[in-house]
Structures are given as C-alpha cells and as structure tokens.
Design a protein with these regions (language model features):
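Subtilisin-like serine protease catalytic core
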Residues: 158-281, 304-309, 340, 364-367, ...
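Autoinhibitory N-terminal propeptides
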Residues: 16-108, 113-158, 636-637
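Short acidic, glycine-rich surface-loop motifs adjacent to enzyme active sites
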Residues: 287-325, 348
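Extracellular S/T/G-rich loop segment that most often corresponds to the catalytic His/Ser-adjacent loop
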Residues: 193-199, 363-463, 467
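Secretory targeting signatures
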Residues: 1-29, 640-707
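Secreted peptidase-domain scaffold signal
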Residues: 55-71, 295, 350, 508-563
C-alpha cells in the first residue's frame, strides 16, 4: 500500500511538468527512445595535389596543358611557402615573376610557351603547373523577393530584425570598380584598391608611380558591372533629389571596400591601353590584398568599420579542363583561404545554363557560398519562382577527396533576372580609371540578369546576419543560409543529403529566417565557432495537430556527414531546458549520410501567450551542438513557462505529501492501536511540525517518459 501511495504522489507531481513537453502518442513499435547506432567516417588528411582530378596522371601538370601548343598563362603552385630562392631560380631561368600569391603558395609567371611546363613541373617544391583561367563577369522586385525588405506579400522579413540594416559591416565588392558618388552609394566608401593598376603598366600608373596599396585609392567604374552589383547589395535607393526610389539593396547601410580587378572592357584582357592587361593576375592579387587587410584599421573611419567582413564576387574563371573545376585550382583555393581567415565569401555559380560542363573556378570553391539565380517572374511572390534558364547547374566536378558534400554546388539561389541597376558614370558620359567621371546625378535604370546579380543580394543578407550576430563564423553563416532556405525541387542526391538540389542548391534564400536564426543564436548565447556542422538535424514541414487539439506533433530528419549523433533534443524555453526526442527504429548500424526520422510533440496551450520558439539540435559524443533548426508557434498562455510548471508541480507535490503524511499517520496510529493499544508515538523534542520534503525553490525535475 505504501508503494502504491508513493506512485500516486509522483504521478500527481509530474503531471503539470509534461504539459508543454510531451512525446508523440504513437505506438512503441513506431518510435523508440534509443537513437540509431551510427558509424563515423574519418576523412584522411591527403594533400590536394594527390587527389585532384585535374591532374589525372599525377605528373604535377594540369591535364589541359599537356596537349596545348603555343603561348599560355601559367601559374605554379608549391607544396610549401614560396621563398626568395624559388623566385630567384625562376628569374635565373628567364621567367618574369608577375606576382606571388602567398595565400595559396603560388607564383604567377604570365604568358610563356607551353613547352616549358614540363621543366617547370620538375622544380623543387612545385606540386602543380596550372593554366590561367579567363575571367568572365556574370552579369525593385529582388530585395522583397528574397525576404530582405518588407512588402504587402511578405510583411515579416529580415529588416524586421535588423536595427541598422547592415551598418558597420564592410562588403568588399571585387569587380570593375564602384562609382560610390552615385546618390544611392554615397558615403559608403571605406577603403579601396586597384589590382589592375598595381600589377600593370597602364599610362596612368606610369604617371603616378602606381596607385596606392594602403586602401586610400578609390576606383571608378568604367564598365557598369561593379556599380550595379554594389547597388543590389547595399544601395539606399535614394536618387539625386534625395527621394526614395524603392531600389534598395538588401543591406542599405552596409559599407564598401572597393577592389577593382576588372577592366573597363569587362572580360579583358585589353582595356584600350597600349599594353595588354592580364585580368587573371589582377583577380588573384586583389583577393590576396583582401586577405592581407581583413583586420586593417582603415584611417579616418570609426572602429566599427575596420577590416573586411564579406567578399562578393560576381564573376568566375574558366578552368579549361573537361568537366570544369574540381575546386582545387589556385583561384578556388584562395577563396577557401579567405573563408578560413574569417572573410565570408559569396560567389556567383555562373551563367552556363543547364547544359554546363561542370562549374568554373571561384564558384567551385569548397568553402565559399556559391549562388545560383532564379527568375522571380517580376513578382514578389515566391511561389512562381523558377530556376533561371542561364544559371549554371551542379554538381561541381568531383575533386577525389571522398567527400560528396564538397561537390554540392550551388549552395543557394536568389533572384537574379531582370533586375534594375544603379547607374555608373559610364552610362551618362565617358569615364574610366584614366578619366574620372561623376555618377552623382545618376539614378537606377536598365534591367540586367545573371548570377552576377543574385550574388550581391545574398551578400547583403550576409551583412544583416553579421550585424545582428558579429560572432558568426563564415562556415556557420553558410550553414544558416542552407538550412533556412526555402526548399525547391526534389533532392538530387538523397543518399547524401535530404534537401540539396542540383538547380537550386539547398533552396531559395530566405532573408527573414537567416537573419532571425542569427539573431536568436546571439540572444540565447549559442556560439557557432565550436558547433559541429557535420551534424544535420532538421524539422520537416509536416507538423500536425492531434485530435485533442493544441498539440503539435513535430517530425524531423537527421543524419551526419562524419561524426556520430549521440542524441537529439528540443526546447520550448530558449534552450534553458532540453528534452530528448523519440527516434525511428532502425535495424543495424547507419553509415555516414544515412538518415533517420525523429518525432516529439508540444502542447501549444501550455506555452506562454504569443510567439514561441521550438528549437531542435543534435549533440555529438563531446557534447558539441549542431546548428539549430526551429519553428515559431503561438502559445495558448495557460501555463507561462516550464519553470512555472515546476512551481505548480511543487505546490501540488507539497499538498499531496502533506495529505499523504496525515493519512499515513492516521493509518499507522490505527494500526498501532490495534496491535499495541497502550503504545503512543511521540515526536522528539523540537520537532513540532513535519519538515518540508523539498526546499522552497524552483524544482529541478526530470520528465518521466514511457519507453
């Protein structure tokens, strides 16, 4: 009887605690309390030149060079730092050192005869002789369509959660220069650099003794491409009269680092100069300058504008290799290095359409955020959006490292078709970097299309994410963009990832959810620098309400790209308390990338009134968290929080305990009277009342579940 009585007490005590956190009411055969067993995968540490597929016979020469005859642009990649001895040796052999790219241990030699590649491959330290690629520029509705700016169709957007619309975030627009005199780009300039002039001897460089490398030079845009792209990232929408046109970028208050790597002619390599300009070398030099200056304290600006946060690239480099780039060429690797240095890279996927032969360099970078383009049909509504006919499709060429996720490009897509452009000085008269122009009276006109124009819109979203959470790491930013994007199309490789699609990547960028996730992580003090991004835990969009009403049943899917998932948890109180989910029963052991489902339920009536966040995460064996996924729901307000539920449980518990003790005392007294009629139970001195069973504080309780 005593055992039965204790059980009743416990049931009455725990009943209120399970009001918000509960488990699905399916049979035990459908769900298990034990997470499926998983086998981890260990990626071997192998040097990139030993697995790249761009050198199939492992002779340290790009395959396309072996049959090429005549002059060709050549770069050498070393397996270590490039030393003075290396450059002196090359010069003694008659080669001109065009540039040393320290970030990827490379030397650019310019145009040489292709017959020399065999001897160059034998030099000490050289691990790859690479062919220069050719630079190609990829080039109203957009901002609200990606859910950055509010509209009647989508009132809840990224700008709802951004107090300053990107203020204090620096975007390095690496392009043909930006005319920041434009009224929508005025006062955005923080620093600039002209890689074209720095490397080459055009007439103005000869006269000026080359331009400044300290960030003080402000390039002009004699092409239009760079100004248009910066406008889509951060134009304020103002015209020369100070009136708002509505043509804002996604982060109107973000600032500009103006890095000119493109010629006025766009694709080069000539810019109507007397001497040819090699665009490839300028591109590599410009990105190296960004890495070198990622933390620079720019003179004359507030401390909040020091350094470089984002690198926006609306162009690509052809690889000349069959099947495109595998991401191991030096121009893709330098973007990896920029990412690892803390600069978030947003790069265009390319405009080669559905029949593209792989992706070009830059867009093939394993660590960058590669952006494809959608056609928004000139409507804000996203339901009618489709992949743009010109947008390059994935996957990227396999690089041979046994990691299929690297080949999943593009990462995301955004509106890139028929976009209004900010006018550069070239649109209203002659101007270039020899003859200064003025775009102060220019406006917004001329629609353009391309992954060039989708990319800066995403760069602006990234600026908003950094604004609300400055601690975000570049790879965490990429993971947030992937996980919050609107899924488009069926999974192209479901055996490796449940969502990635070869046209859309992980989906159409959702500005609101990306910025809100970034803000929420900051509010609940979840740092992303030590997150395990290999753990994939996602809610599915098929939540339902049970027959009882007010109970949401959540279903999700999970897998791992390497490490083992030890548990999956959910929280309804901002991560203060976590509850384990139920799992799909699985026979045997799951290998890497194999997925399983999970489920849990939440009683919405017992959540605080108003919006509530339901968050879910995975945990590995070291206790490290995955990126969170979430859903927002409206609570019924019948119970404020889980802590309040605990307080109610404590009151009920004390009441039950008091009643139980009284009944038990009467029962003992009666029993004693029957068996020992003259014996009385007398409490010891100083104990006039029965002590409380627990301290008067918030009860730290554990939810009891039925296995």
């Amino acid at each position: 009887m005593r055992a039965h009585f204790a059980l009743i007490c416990l049931v009455l005590f725990f009943a209120p605690l399970t009001g918000s956190l509960s488990q699905p009411e399916q049979s035990e055969s459908q769900w298990s309390s034990v997470i499926p067993t998983m086998t981890p995968v260990v990626h071997q540490e192998v040097d990139w030149w030993d697995y790249t597929t761009m050198d199939s016979n492992r002779n340290a020469i790009h395959d396309s060079l072996e049959t090429l005859q005549g002059p060709v642009g050549i770069g050498l990649s070393y397996g270590r730092d490039v030393t003075d001895i290396d450059t002196q040796l090359l010069e003694s052999l008659g080669y001109e050192i065009r540039d040393v790219i320290e970030a990827v241990d490379a030397v650019l030699l310019g145009i040489i005869d292709s017959s020399n590649v065999w001897n160059l491959s034998q030099l000490d330290g050289v691990v790859m002789v690479e062919r220069y690629g050719q630079i190609i520029l990829y080039g109203d509705i957009q901002t609200p369509n990606i859910l950055a700016e509010q509209s009647d169709v989508y009132p809840h957007t990224a700008w709802n959660h951004s107090e300053t619309l990107g203020l204090g975030v620096n975007i390095a627009m690496v392009d043909t220069g930006v005319d920041n005199e434009h009224p929508g780009l005025n006062e955005k300039f923080v620093a600039g650099y002209d890689a074209v002039c720095y490397l080459h001897t055009d007439p103005s460089c000869i006269l000026s003794g080359a331009r400044e490398t300290d960030g003080s030079f402000d390039p002009d845009d004699g092409n239009q491409h760079g100004t248009a792209c910066m406008g889509m990232a951060s134009a304020t929408g103002l015209d020369s009269n100070g009136e708002q046109t509505g043509f804002e970028g996604s982060a109107p208050n973000a600032s500009l680092i103006d890095v000119r790597i493109g010629t006025d002619a766009g694709a080069g390599p000539f810019e109507n100069y007397l001497i040819p300009q090699e665009f490839y070398e300028s591109a590599m030099n410009g990105i190296q300058w960004i890495i070198d200056n990622k933390d620079t304290a720019w003179p004359g600006v507030d401390e909040s504008l020091y350094g470089i946060d984002i690198l926006s690239l609306s162009w690509g480099i052809t690889s000349h290799e069959t099947g495109g780039s595998d991401g191991e060429d030096m121009h893709s690797r330098i973007l990896n290095e920029a990412t690892l240095a803390g600069v978030t890279v947003s790069v265009a996927a390319g405009n080669d359409g559905p029949s593209n032969d792989g992706l070009s360099g830059m867009g093939s970078s394993s660590l960058s955020i590669t952006v494809g383009a959608t056609d928004d049909m000139n409507t804000i509504e996203r339901d009618d959006d489709d992949i743009a006919s010109y947008s390059s499709r994935g996957p990227r060429r396999d690089n041979g490292d046994s990691n299929p996720i690297n080949e999943m490009k593009p990462d995301v897509t955004a509106s890139g078709s028929n976009i209004i452009q900010a006018e550069a000085c070239v649109t209203t008269g002659g101007c270039n970097n020899l003859i200064n122009g003025d775009a102060a009276d220019n406006g917004y006109t001329g629609r353009g299309s391309g992954t060039s124009y989708a990319t800066p819109a995403v760069s602006g979203i990234i600026a908003l994410m950094i604004e609300v959470n400055p601690e975000l790491e570049p790879l965490a930013i990429r993971e947030i963009l992937r996980s919050t994007s609107t899924r488009m199309g069926e999974a192209s490789q479901p055996e490796h990832d449940a969502f990635w699609n070869e046209d859309f990547g992980w989906g159409l960028v959702h500005g609101h959810d990306a910025v809100w996730t970034s803000l929420y992580l900051n509010e609940i003090n979840m740092t992303t620098s030590d997150m395990n991004l290999d753990l994939q835990v996602h809610l599915l969009p098929n939540n339902s309400t049970s027959d009882e009403g007010g109970v949401n049943i959540y279903n999700g899917i999970a897998w791992s790209r390497g490490d083992v998932l030890e548990t999956i948890e959910f929280s309804v109180d901002g991560g203060s308390t976590w509850e384990e989910v139920y799992y799909e029963p699985v026979n045997g052991t799951l290998s890497t990338y194999e997925s399983f489902e999970f489920s849990f339920s939440v009683n919405l009536d017992t959540l605080p009134a108003g919006y509530n966040m339901i968050i879910v995460r995975g945990i590995d064996s070291s206790g490290t968290s995955s990126m969170i996924d979430w859903d927002s729901v409206i609570g019924g307000g019948q119970m404020m929080t889980l802590s309040d539920a605990s307080s109610l449980g404590r009151v009920l518990f004390l009441s039950v305990v008091g009643l139980a003790v009284a009944i038990f005392g009467v029962w003992v007294f009666v029993n004693q009277k029957v068996t020992e009629p003259f014996a009385l139970i007398v409490p010891p001195e100083g104990t006039e009342e029965i002590p409380l069973a627990i301290e008067d504080g918030i009860l730290d309780a554990e939810i009891i579940k039925d296995d």
